[in-house]
Structures are given as structure tokens and as C-alpha cells.
Amino acid sequence: MSTYLEFEKPIEVLDNKIFELKSLNDSAPSESLLEEITNVEQEINDTYKKIYSSISPWQRTLVARHTDRPKTQHYIEGLIENFFPLSGDRAFSEDKAIIGGFGKFRGKTVLVIGHEKGHDTTSRIEHNFGMPRPEGYRKAQRLMKLAEDFDIPVISFVDTPGAYPGVGAEQRGQSEAIAKTTECCLSLGVPIVVVIIGEGGSGGAVAIGTGNTVLMLENSIYSVISPEGCSSILWKDNSKTVEAASALKLTADDMLKIDVIDKII
């Protein structure tokens, strides 16, 4: 079942209507029902366009975080053939908040790395909600250097609220791992294409979000801090998230205007 945001309620009403009409048509097929279904489907498309043409930065943040939004694993399954995952940083452990491996994209061998949030409670815990620890970033470095050795280009999918802020991560050198991974991206001898597919949260995103070409999905975000964090710091009030989201200029349009990204998808 789909999950609807508050401003998507008109779409939910129409989707429920479609479900009822299709159920009726399954039990008693008729041309008039099929015609009505077609009309309602068109109304849904029109409503989507109308709503999404004027949503606020905060609403776009909610869309970027939507539980039904495709994750890195979904993009790999849909775009990459013969994907072969690789694990571990060869120094401490495996961090499933960043996944990576080799496969073929349109017939060409590529390295794919990306944040993985998970899609349900179990997988979200397994992937630490897409918040990498130092070993995740060091794994990304290892894989990128391996790609460089074999002259293989890199595709990086960015979708994280930020690097994991736990004590253990700090003790194992979180800031150093982020800095070194960013440096690795900047100095790598093969092309890197970055795609921001959901949340681009602070240094945790920049670490694998630095590339030759940076693309960004229309309803994704990229920011130095979350609206909630900004609200609590600037206003000392967690209720100012709407104002904070607008002030942060975190949308794809904002990023394109200041040349942080190259293109909006």
C-alpha cells in the first residue's frame, strides 16, 4: 500500500476511487467503467503535476525522504547487469550503509557505489538507515582505487541523512574517513558520475558525492545540515523546519543555480 504525504491527500482520494472502480470492473466489466477509470487516471496525472509544480522546500524534503522512494539497491537492480557486490574495508569491518560492486551499464563495465537506507524495518537497521561509519567510507575508497587500477568508471548514488554520529564512529576516525574519501574522489584517475537520488546530507553525502558530473533528481535535496538541525541551532526551536528548509536553499533548482550540480533529472 502506498504511503501518502499530507499534501498528497487529493491523490490518495483519487487512488482509492481507482481501486474501487477497478474492483467493480473486475466483477462486472463494462465500457463505461473502463472509460471512467481512464478519466480518473488522467485526473491523477494532472493532480500530481499541479501539486508538485508548487511544493515548498520543506515538502520537497519530505518527498526526498519518502519511505516508498527507490533506494540505491533498486537502481542497481533496474540499471546494472551482472552486478557483483564487494564488501569490507580490509581494515575493520563491513558497513552496509554503503554498498558497492562491479557490473555493466549499457554494456560497459562500471563500479557502482552508493548509500543504502533499506526499505523496511529489518533492512533499515541492517543498513544503519543509510548513515555510514568510517569503515563504509574506507570501503568506498578501496573500491574506487580498484576501479582506477582497471580503468573502470564510477557511478555513485547519494542518499543519506548524514554520516553516523556515534561515539564508535568518532573513535575510529569518522572525519578523517570522510575527508580521505572526498580526496579520493577528487584525485581519482577515472570518471565519476554522481547521482543524488534522495537526501544529500552534509559531509556524509559529499564524501562519495564529488565527481566529474553531478546529477540530481528533481525531488531530492542537498544540504550542509537538515532543516530540523538548522531550526534547532538558528531558532532554538524545532518547529521552524519550514523556514529552515527555505533558508538552506537545498532543492535541485537551488543547487543548479549555484553550480553545485550539473544537471537536474
List PLM regions with ranges.
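Short active-site-adjacent helix-start/loop capping segments
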Residues: P70-T72, D120-T122, Y164-G166
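Short coil/turn segments at secondary-structure boundaries
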Residues: P57-R60, R90-D95
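Glycine-rich beta-alpha loop segments
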Residues: S53, G78, N82, F92-E94, ...
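Amphipathic alpha-helical segments at domain termini/boundaries
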Residues: M1-N82, I225-I265
